């Protein structure tokens, strides 16, 4: 055996344990991180699930940790009655579903224009889209409210009616109009997601469609939309969840209409419970009822959501 061969075998014999140790260390680190993140996310959910079925006596029983001793549905009943749960659930689902579908169309069209159509000022306009992501919506709260409180589309309302303007507050129209113009909740982010995905589609595909006689809209519908399914799923889920949990716009535009987010904010006043600990338990039950539909939805679409996030490159 030559000295070179002996040296190689010695190096390999020493190198393999080191690599194996690094591999096991990386597995341990990943396991700790995954378990830690799961604990952070799932602990509040399991805690609220346990609280929802406890009786008032279980609150002050130090032996009750997770499993209720006096199992009851009273907390759920009180939370449902106080929040007008089913009415609020229907309104929330209607607003979330309608605005999500409208935003999907308007943001995709706007993003397609930024990604494929060359026109003067496109860079400036896209920069303004990015600004809408950065600037908090609270800074334009008063203009937004006044726009829909005294709505007048270029003076056309006065031409066709005796009123100078329309009051769209306490209706769904502010959500529909803002979503139709790609100015709704988080629409700047959705335009950015679609634009980046459309830019990743080879230009040759669109050019071939134009050569075959397809126009801009036909190319968008026949070429871009079928290839943008991952981006569509991502925007669909993000838009629905954000709209479901929104409390800013609904409290600004809907004063009398019941939705889940505002019902939860008013729940503490409606309970009139002198015991603050029991009030907190009922509020936690209300939160659980509000997020339950989202959890059920995620259980059915989680595979599509993970695939879409991986393909669009959305992280964080």
For each predicted feature, which ranges?
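A structural signal for multi-pass alpha-helical bundles of membrane permease subunits
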Residues: 4-12, 18-22, 26-316
